[in-house]
């Protein structure tokens, strides 16, 4: 209501001289936070006519108010009135009374004295009855009593004869008084949401009734209603009506007829007599046929008959010439009548989920058609006449589609030889059949029971290496988190449908699934699984090779193997063993991941290598890789089928390494560990792909880097091909040609996938392997192809597709790819260059599911990359083209993994590089946490298309095998330019993590890093040239580094490879960044980051690349957060200065943290501006989404998340962990992230703090693990245990805890913050990556990792989910806030990213606040404070309910999309009445802040202006005065 002022007075020349006063008739005190009626009102009691007191906190009306005899309108809605005083009777002239939204329980009897009342608005009050006096208000024309407690109306209600509008919605009325027939003037009657079981008899007597709402009641028949000749609008939806009378034609004036959600089996022919009908909705009924007379509705504009059982449409539908909207979704239509072409005014037509096998040519006549949804049908192609639809703006062929319009190409029909239109999404594979199958076929009761018993403990028997090699693919873990925990059923191999049933947790499908045959010719099933995220939750994909990693991932891609690596508590002995295992994994190329298909892995390696040199055609090699897992086709299918199974429980089951000789079992145990971690990661990430991906990723991380690289290369080619996944993987594709096609999402889709390259992948020996790195769909997708050898089709396709779009295939891909990779990761390691496989889990880290969109499933991505021609790949490749210059062209990015398995696993393996068995450490703590959020999202189907893989990313766990020695060295060589030899060198476990660098750009960075695929050379301990690149990615020179230094080879992605991707893949496809307008990840990671000194940069670049899991670890990266964390911990803190890190583009932030692995790496990252700051590492993202009980995906979610919930992508809600995870679980989740954070270089992770004293050149120190790193690590762990409260809730970890001391908690926090802050510059460009849930997780994880630069295992201790004490939190509060903000924002944006520019609007740049917020203790104390490390996962922070602070960037469109309350002079807030701060009270669902803010958020700053002690009005004006971009620092109470 607008404030009105009437000035009544004599027109005097100058009233001011005459002393005349204005006569006030209208006063408006709305929204003034008043607790009582202002006394000024009474000064005008004689003249006051209108008084507005809306939205205050008035509890009672003073008697004086009723002396205002002239008052005609009294408006007091939204206050705290509990009653109306009887003195209201004195307002005899009152005409309008509005008391809605109060606590008024009844009207006083004497309200009858207000004879002039014409309008009463009393909705939303606990009014249980109306007094008899109420019926004496004879002048009443409008009465609104919605949402009250009325059970009946007064018997003489009919006396209100002048009533025109009567709204009684949402009450408890069961009948109407008979006197109602006297309401002759009643035109609108709303009785919706009441308890009518039959239509009141009096209704047919209200002849003038024009609008009638009777929805949401229990009506079964509609007698008499057809007698209302004047009726224009009739809503009878949501009742139990079974039949409609022939008399319906009596309502001859009817224009809108809504009969949705009833039990109608047919419509009467007389419906054709409703000549004026413009809207007819009969959706959600049981109609089997439509009457032919429907063609007589010549004025019909909207017709909705979705969700029925129609098997045909009447040909008379062609007479509906006025029709504009036609919805026939979810029916059983095998074809459309040719006459439909006559409906030439139709602009929107949806035919989703039918059985259409072909479309009539006549559709080409529907010239005005703008939106056409054909998803989930059985179309093999489109008629050539589609080329005539010039106005077509959206053509939906798949639920996983990332772009509204996907290019079509002309082909000749194989049978008729006619020209038809097709693309990679054809032929369609309906998910329905698959879904139906998965419930029964893929459900294994025995497996379910076994898993249920073991859900909380995953025991991996690590036998001798031989056994490990043989069984690497098998998940020995017998128990996983029960699927029910994830709301999933353990559907073993074919959860094609898994419609949200309780799937076993990732279906302990590991072994069983592996052993279970996966229908090779089950593309539909796989597709169904993938396509239905809802299914994917329940799906438990078998992870043949990924068994080691326990097929948790198969579950939903979220829970994958999350717990596999969870150690109840990382006791010193355990840590040592774990480290040894990791080292062994790193040191032993193929034993660790060897699976039943280990031989195939070897083949894959060779094949991959060949692929590396070939282009897409090499796909068969990828297939081989897939074969190594199980049957490539089967695996793929399985992966596809059980993507949802990948979901891991928020708190993954704990893994217990049964092997006593961890070193011996390192091969298997390490691999298994890796698998476990990675699986967890991938499952968390994949969500859709989880079964195979997570498993495969985890188990098969071993996939050869070579194959990964090959995949990446292929991916480039594939992307070039666009959607030729089938071509890429002819063999596996055969099994799932449709899937592959589907998977090959349009280029538009690709970027989404690219958003989330598995960091692990990149990390894996093929940091250079663009494909790995490109988890996001870039090279990583190619890598997925390699993983595809598990399910070649699935993998390569899935990756690509997943990158691209959300093809259902993607889901499948994801599921399958990872397990293989994990399994074969070890094999892949076989080649020296392929040493990286040692970190198999990295690969599995994330295979993006269609929804996840390359969340964090490197293996999936990797598999897809080589073979999949998804546009996404192209996009990544293009971006990588920009990167190529920085990469040394020397080593093309041949896939170093010889094993076909290598796919993503390989990438991880490369990253693992097995630098030194003794030194390799597996950090899993974070990855598990990440995974869980992602899984959570998957579970809740939070992933949005946009979220796709990216969002899902956070669900995966990444484990990096980082030899402690390599910490420093690995760090050095892990730089973006990570030396091939380093990466490949067994001692370069960290090298294998090089992908961490690319993480930020999972897409193009993968390419870039892929080119630095040094891993092939990795084993050679020769001097390598490390190339430095300027920000433009132009090589500035090569620095020769000795192998011992473990400087990662310059990104040896062959510039050719990288370039190829760049050329082949549209930038949009190449990288989510590019897609969203963000600078390519590669650019973001450009080595030009000046902050790192050139030399250090060179080393750092290489070291960073390999060493920083973070790099790889973009939110999308598959590498487990912990691994990345470890890598980064080793190198990043020392090598990068906080400023450097921050200097990097936002993507880099997360990666940076992971990059902390080595100084050189971090420097490189800085230089790149990508690794750390550019986007959060996958871990970070994951940490955000996963670590924090953030509600990912949704809102990401999505994330996407998705969806990841927008709540706080990085917030603790990501993982709905109600109970704190055990220390082991925490460690397992956090280590990788923590490790990243721990990298000595990261002290400046709180980069703004610039605490990181280690100079850029410190990279060496970063790269090298302190001699006593183990002790330090153990101390850190112990300290963390003791000081968990000391750690920041967020990823801010006292860096001091880390052995590198130099990296203090600040560093870790900074890492988180960095992502946000750095992002502020590049927000739009780079945030997308971070926005992916996985990235977000990475950020969180990374922050933690950065925080504790000490031992690799430090992350475990740090990884605890304990929330640091408030004091610490406050110290790093700002920092944390920014981190959190960035995480949550990133997470959201991630969700949004794949499909929308949301990323832009929510750029999670860490305002300077994150950096500024130093963690003094963390900075000051580096080594000694492990206990303090913020290693607590970001997810943890919310667990304790600590308020988290975030940085949120909102782009006005046109407004900010949220409402605030509170302030010094405000009316308070409903969240914390005692807090006078500014709180967000409402967020517009689809507005700019929808994914960023949530009610209850406290605004601390806006564009630098403090909102802590600000008046409400000033805050409103300030927010309105800002231009387009508003950067907020908010505080959110995060609770799990």
From Swiss-Prot:
Pfam families: LRR_14 (PF23598), LRR_8 (PF13855), PDZ (PF00595). The keyword Ribosomal protein does not apply. Keywords: Cytoplasm, Leucine-rich repeat, Methylation, Phosphoprotein, Repeat, Synapse. The modification Phosphoserine is found at residues 438, 440, 442, 849, 868, 946, 948, 1117, 1232, 1334, 1438. One of its GO terms (biological process) is neurotransmitter receptor transport, endosome to postsynaptic membrane. The modification Phosphothreonine is found at residues 830, 864. InterPro entries: Leu-rich_rpt, Leu-rich_rpt_typical-subtyp, LRR_dom_sf, LRR_R13L4/SHOC2-like, PDZ, PDZ_sf, Synaptic_Scaffolding_LAP-MAGUK. GO terms for cellular component: adherens junction; axon initial segment; basolateral plasma membrane; cytoplasm; postsynaptic density. One of its GO terms (molecular function) is protein kinase binding. CDD domains: PDZ_densin_erbin-like (cd06749). This is Leucine-rich repeat-containing protein 7. It comes from Bos taurus (Bovine).
């Amino acid at each position: 209501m607008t404030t009105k002022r009437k000035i009544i007075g004599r027109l005097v020349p100058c009233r001011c001289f005459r002393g005349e006063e204005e006569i006030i008739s209208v006063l408006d005190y709305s929204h003034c936070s008043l607790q009582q009626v202002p006394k000024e009102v009474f000064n005008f009691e004689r003249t006051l006519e209108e008084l507005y007191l809306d939205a205050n906190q008035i509890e009672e009306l003073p008697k004086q108010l009723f002396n205002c005899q002239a008052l005609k309108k009294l408006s007091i809605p939204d206050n705290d009135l509990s009653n109306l005083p009887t003195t209201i009777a004195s307002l005899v002239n009152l005409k309008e009374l509005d008391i809605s939204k109060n606590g008024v329980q009844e009207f006083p009897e004497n309200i009858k004295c207000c004879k002039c009342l014409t309008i009463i608005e009393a909705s939303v009050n606990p009014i249980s009855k109306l007094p008899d006096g109420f019926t004496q208000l004879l002048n009443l024309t409008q009465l609104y009593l919605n949402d009250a407690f009325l059970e009946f109306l007064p018997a003489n209600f009919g006396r209100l004869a002048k009533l025109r509008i009567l709204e009684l919605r949402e009450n408890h009325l069961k009948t109407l008084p008979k006197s109602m027939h006297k309401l002759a003037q009643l035109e609108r009657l709303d009785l919706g949401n009441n308890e009518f079981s039959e239509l009141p008899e009096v209704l047919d007597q209200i002849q003038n009734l024009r609008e009638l709402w009777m929805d949401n009641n229990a009506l079964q028949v509609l007698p008499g209603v057809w007698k209302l000749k004047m009726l224009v609008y009739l809503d009878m939806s949501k009742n139990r009506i079974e039949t409609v009378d022939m008399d319906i034609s009596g309502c001859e004036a009817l224009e809108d007829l809504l009969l949705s959600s009833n039990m109608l089996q047919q419509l009467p022919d007389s419906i054709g007599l409703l000549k004026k009908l413009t809207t007819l909705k009969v959706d959600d009924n049981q109609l089997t046929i439509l009457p032919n007379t429907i063609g007589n509705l010549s004025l019909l504009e909207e017709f909705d008959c979705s969700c029925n059982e129609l098997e045909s449409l009447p040909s008379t539908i062609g007479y509906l010439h006025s029709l504009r909207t036609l919805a026939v979704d979810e029916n059983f239509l095998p074809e459309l009548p040719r006459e439909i072409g006559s409906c030439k005014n139709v602009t929107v037509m949806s035919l989703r989920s039918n059985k259409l096998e072909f479309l009539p040519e006549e559709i080409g006549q529907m010239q005005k058609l703008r939106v056409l949804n054909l998803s989930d049908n059985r179309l093999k192609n489109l008629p050539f006449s589609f080329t005539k639809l010039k106005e077509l703006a959206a053509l939906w062929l798949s639920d996983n589609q990332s772009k509204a319009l996907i290019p079509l190409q002309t082909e000749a029909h194989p049978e008729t030889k006619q020209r038809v239109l097709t693309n990679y999404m054809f032929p369609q594979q309906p998910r329905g059949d698959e879904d139906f199958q998965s419930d029964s076929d893929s459900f294994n009761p025995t497996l379910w029971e076994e898993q249920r018993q073991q859900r909380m403990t995953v025991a991996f028997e690590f036998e001798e290496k031989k056994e490990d090699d043989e069984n690497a693919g098998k998940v020995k873990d017998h128990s996983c988190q029960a699927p029910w925990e994830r709301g999933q059923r353990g559907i073993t191999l074919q959860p094609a449908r898994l419609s949200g049933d309780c799937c076993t947790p990732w279906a302990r499908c590991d072994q069983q699934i592996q052993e279970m045959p996966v229908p090779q010719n089950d593309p539909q099933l796989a597709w169904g699984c993938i396509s239905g995220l809802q299914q994917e939750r329940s799906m438990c994909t078998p992870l043949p090779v990924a068994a080691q990693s326990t097929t948790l991932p198969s579950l939903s891609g979220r829970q994958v193997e999350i717990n596999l690596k969870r150690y109840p508590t990382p006791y010193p002995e355990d840590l040592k063993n774990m480290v040894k295992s990791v080292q062994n994994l790193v040191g032993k190329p193929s034993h660790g991941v060897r699976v039943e298909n280990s031989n195939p892995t070897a083949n894959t390696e060779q094949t991959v290598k060949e692929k590396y040199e070939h282009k897409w055609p090499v796909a068969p090699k990828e297939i081989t890789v897939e074969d190594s897992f199980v049957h490539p086709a089967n695996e793929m299918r399985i992966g596809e089928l059980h993507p949802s199974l990948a979901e891991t429980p928020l708190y993954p089951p704990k893994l217990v390494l049964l092997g006593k000789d961890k070193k011996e079992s390192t091969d298997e145990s390490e691999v298994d560990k890796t698998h476990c971690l990675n699986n967890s990661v991938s499952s968390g990430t994949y969500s859709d792909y989880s079964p195979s991906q997570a498993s495969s990723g985890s188990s098969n991380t071993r996939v050869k880097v070579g194959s990964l690289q090959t995949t990446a290369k292929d991916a480039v080619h594939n992307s070039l091909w666009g959607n030729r996944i089938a071509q890429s993987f002819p063999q596996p594709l055969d099994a799932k040609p449709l899937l592959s096609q589907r998977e090959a999402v349009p280029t538009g889709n690709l970027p989404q996938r690219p958003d989330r390259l598995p960091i692990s992948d990149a990390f894996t020996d093929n940091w250079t392997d663009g494909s790995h790195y490109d988890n996001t769909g870039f090279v990583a997708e190619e890598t997925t192809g390699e993983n595809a050898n598990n399910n070649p089709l699935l993998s390569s396709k899935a990756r690509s597709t997943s990158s691209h779009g959300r093809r259902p295939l993607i889901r499948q891909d994801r599921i399958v790819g990872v397990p293989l990779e994990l399994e074969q990761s070890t094999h892949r390691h076989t080649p020296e260059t392929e040493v990286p496989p040692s970190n198999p889990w990295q690969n599995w880290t994330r295979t993006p599911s269609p929804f996840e969109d390359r969340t964090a499933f490197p293996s999936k991505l990797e598999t897809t990359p080589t073979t999949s021609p998804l546009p996404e790949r192209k996009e990544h490749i293009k971006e990588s083209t920009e990167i190529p210059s920085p990469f040394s062209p020397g080593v093309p990015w041949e896939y170093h993994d010889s094993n076909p398995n290598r796919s993503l696993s390989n990438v991880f393996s490369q990253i693992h590089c097995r630098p030194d068995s003794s030194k390799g450490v597996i950090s899993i703590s974070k990855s598990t946490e990440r995974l869980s959020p992602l899984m959570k999202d998957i579970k809740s189907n939070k992933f949005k298309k946009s979220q796709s893989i990216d969002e899902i990313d956070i669900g995966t766990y990444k484990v990096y095998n980082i030899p402690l020695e390599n910490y420093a060295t690995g760090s050095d060589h892990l730089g973006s330019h990570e030396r091939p030899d380093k990466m490949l060198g067994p001692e370069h476990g960290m090298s294998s993590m090089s992908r961490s660098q690319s993480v930020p750009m999972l897409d193009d960075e993968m390419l870039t890093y892929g080119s630095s695929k040094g891993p092939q050379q990795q084993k050679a301990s020769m001097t390598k040239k490390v190339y430095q690149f300027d920000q433009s990615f132009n090589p500035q020179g090569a620095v020769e580094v000795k192998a011992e230094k473990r400087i990662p080879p310059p990104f040896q992605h062959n510039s050719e490879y990288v370039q190829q991707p760049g050329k082949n893949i549209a930038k949009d496809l190449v990288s989510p960044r590019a897609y969203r307008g963000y600078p390519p990840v590669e650019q973001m990671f450009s080595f030009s980051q000046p902050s790192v000194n050139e030399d250090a940069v060179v080393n750092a670049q290489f070291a960073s690349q390999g060493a920083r899991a973070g790099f790889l670890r973009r939110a999308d990266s598959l590498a487990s957060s912990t691994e990345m964390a470890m890598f980064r911990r080793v190198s990043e803190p020392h090598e990068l200065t906080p400023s450097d890190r921050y200097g990097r583009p936002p993507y880099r932030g997360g990666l940076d943290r992971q990059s902390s692995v080595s100084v050189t790496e971090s420097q490189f990252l800085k230089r790149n501006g990508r690794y750390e700051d550019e986007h959060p590492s996958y871990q970070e993202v994951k940490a955000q989404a996963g670590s924090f009980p953030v509600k990912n995906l949704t809102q990401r979610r999505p994330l996407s998340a998705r969806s990841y919930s927008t709540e706080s992508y990085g917030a603790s809600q990501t993982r709905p962990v109600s109970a704190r995870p055990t220390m082991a679980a925490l460690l397992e989740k956090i280590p990788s992230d923590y490790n990243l954070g721990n990298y000595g270089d990261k002290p400046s992770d709180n980069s703004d703090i610039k605490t990181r004293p280690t100079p850029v050149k410190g990279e060496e120190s970063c790269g090298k693990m302190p001699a006593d790193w183990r002790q330090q690590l153990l101390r850190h762990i112990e300290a963390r245990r003791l000081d968990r409260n000391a750690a920041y809730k967020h990823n801010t970890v006292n860096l001091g805890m880390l052995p590198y001391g130099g990296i203090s908690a600040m560093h870790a926090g900074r890492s988180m913050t960095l992502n946000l802050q750095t992002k502020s510059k590049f927000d739009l460009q780079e945030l997308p990556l971070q926005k992916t849930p996985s990235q977000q997780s990475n950020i969180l994880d990374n922050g933690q990792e950065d925080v504790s630069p000490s031992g690799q295992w430090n992350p475990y201790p740090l990884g605890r989910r304990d929330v640091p004490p408030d004091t610490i939190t406050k110290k790093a509060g700002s920092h944390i806030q920014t981190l959190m903000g960035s995480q949550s924002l990133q997470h959201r944006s991630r969700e949004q990213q794949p499909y929308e520019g949301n990323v832009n609007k929510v750029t999670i740049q860490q305002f300077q606040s994150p950096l500024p917020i130093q963690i003094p203790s963390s900075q000051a104390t580096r080594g000694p404070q492990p206990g303090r490390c913020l290693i607590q996962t970001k997810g943890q922070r919310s667990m304790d309910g600590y308020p988290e602070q975030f940085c949120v960037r909102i782009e006005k469109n046109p407004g900010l999309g949220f409402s605030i309350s509170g302030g010094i002079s405000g009316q308070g807030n409903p969240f914390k009445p005692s807090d006078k701060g500014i709180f967000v009270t409402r967020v517009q669902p689809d507005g700019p802040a929808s994914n960023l803010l949530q009610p209850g958020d406290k605004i601390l700053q806006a564009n630098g202006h403090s909102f802590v002690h600000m008046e409400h009005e000033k805050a409103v004006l300030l927010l309105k005065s800002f231009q387009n971009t508003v950067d907020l620092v908010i505080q959110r109470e995060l609770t799990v």
